[in-house]
Regions:
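Transmembrane helix boundary and interhelical loop/hinge segments in multi-pass membrane proteins
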Residues: 1-13
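Juxtamembrane helix-boundary/capping and inter-helix hinge elements in multi-pass membrane proteins
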Residues: 12-18, 139
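Short juxtamembrane and helix-loop transition motifs at transmembrane-helix boundaries
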Residues: 16-24, 45-56, 81
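Selective transmembrane-helix segments that form parts of the transport pathway or gating/packing helices
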Residues: 17-43, 63, 150
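Hydrophobic alpha-helical transmembrane segments
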Residues: 43-45, 76-77
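Membrane-spanning alpha-helical segments of multipass transporters and channels
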Residues: 50-172
Length: 172
């Protein structure tokens, strides 16, 4: 990630690392937002898929989930550099599997035997919120999941800023 000439110039620029990171994240999130609007509009207006009565929670879950995953990708790229794409892909498949997206029973196995994993897996929080908003009237767990996703975004973002401050190039 930061081995390229562009990354080296960016890292030694007199711009704060926080501004650089916020710019990167904003651009990627803007692209995600456009994609989300197109997909959601297609599912809702063209295919007429019912999303339940809590559209605002579904939309907020999708947006916060997207932000957390963008931040996770950013942090993994900072840590692993050359192997980041492979690790992100593998991590996404594992997180999705553990959230029950390939095998419904897995979600319940994880919740019974590794409950902490169910609360730190973004895919599990997102799928759980979609399930909760469609089937239940009590949204307290959905709000908890949104809070956890928000906290994850802040913590991962803080880590990224901290990690970027340590990057320097003595010999260019």
């Amino acid at each position: 990630a930061d081995e390229s000439d562009v990354a080296k110039r960016t890292n030694i620029a007199p711009t704060s690392k926080l501004k650089l990171m916020l710019t990167d994240i904003s651009v990627v999130f803007s692209i995600y937002l456009v994609q989300f609007i197109i997909l959601f509009s297609y599912l809702f207006f063209v295919l007429k898929i019912p999303f339940g009565d809590n559209l605002q929670i579904i939309i907020l879950t999708a947006l916060l989930g997207g932000l957390v995953n963008i931040m996770l990708g950013y942090s993994i790229a900072l840590i692993f550099k050359a192997k980041a794409i492979s690790i992100i892909s593998f991590g996404g498949v594992i997180a999705s599997f553990l959230s029950g997206m390939q095998f419904v029973g897995m979600k319940y196995l994880v919740e019974q035997h590794l409950p902490l994993l169910a609360y730190i897996n973004p895919a599990a929080l997102i799928t759980d919120n979609f399930y909760i908003t469609y089937y239940y009237n009590d949204l307290s767990r959905a709000y908890l999941n949104l809070g956890i996703l928000g906290l994850m975004a802040v913590l991962i973002g803080t880590y990224c800023v901290y990690r970027m401050k340590g990057v320097s190039y003595d010999s260019l």
